[in-house]
């Protein structure tokens, strides 16, 4: 009976050793994700501190070597403490620039606005246009629109009218003035009633007509 127990103990001692050496694998007991990532990083990205510099694509540069870290970066020099990059004073971008590229150390304007925008419409440089009958405008090289409003002369009548597509009022019936509530033409004497003859002041249409009484020609009553 004692012999059987001893043999059993020997089997128990041997079996764990066999399992450890033959059956255990990394697939059965995977390592922690953090340990795997750290291990992979060490394999892919070597530590070049104090030895060189690495750009965005993983290319290694020696100490003292000049390189561009990325397609839109300023040039750098690989130093002991890491890249030392230029910081130039870039030219200002034109305020009318419509397309800016960042493919170098400084941004570059590739397309400048070459038109003017006015009330939702675009006009070429130096193009003249009339947004209304009374306005004359031009697209300046500065991409700004300058407009001038028509300076209309004072009409020589008391009843001017506005024609379509014309800015300034016109006197369809020529110069005139008021004689009381009656409009009379300028340049002649006009009998406005049985007793009064009136005429407009020369050039002063806004003044009331000058009138004089004559012998009344109305019917006399007894």
UniProtKB/Swiss-Prot annotation:
Its main location: secreted. It is found in: Secreted; Synapse. GO terms for cellular component: AMPA glutamate receptor complex; extracellular space; synapse. Pfam families: VWC2L_1st, VWC2L_2nd, VWC2L_C. GO terms for biological process: negative regulation of BMP signaling pathway; positive regulation of neuron differentiation. InterPro entries: VWC2/VWC2L (IPR042979), VWF_dom (IPR001007). Residues 51-110, 114-172 form the VWFC domain. Residues 1-21 form the signal peptide. Keywords: Developmental protein, Repeat, Secreted, Signal, Synapse. Predominantly expressed in the brain (at protein level). Also detected in bones, including femur and calvaria, heart, lung and kidney. Isoform 5 is predominant in lung and heart, compared to isoforms 1 and 3. Isoform 4 is expressed in femur and calvaria at higher levels than isoforms 1 and 5. Isoforms 1 and 4 are expressed at higher levels than isoform 5 in kidney and brain. May play a role in neurogenesis. May promote matrix mineralization, but has been shown to weakly, but significantly inhibit BMP2 and BMP6 activity in a preosteoblastic cell line. PANTHER family: BRORIN FAMILY MEMBER, VON WILLEBRAND FACTOR C DOMAIN-CONTAINING PROTEIN 2-LIKE. Peripherally associated with AMPAR complex. AMPAR complex consists of an inner core made of 4 pore-forming GluA/GRIA proteins (GRIA1, GRIA2, GRIA3 and GRIA4) and 4 major auxiliary subunits arranged in a twofold symmetry. One of the two pairs of distinct binding sites is occupied either by CNIH2, CNIH3 or CACNG2, CACNG3. The other harbors CACNG2, CACNG3, CACNG4, CACNG8 or GSG1L. This inner core of AMPAR complex is complemented by outer core constituents binding directly to the GluA/GRIA proteins at sites distinct from the interaction sites of the inner core constituents. This is von Willebrand factor C domain-containing protein 2-like. It comes from Mus musculus. The lineage of its organism: Eukaryota, Metazoa, Chordata, Craniata, Vertebrata.
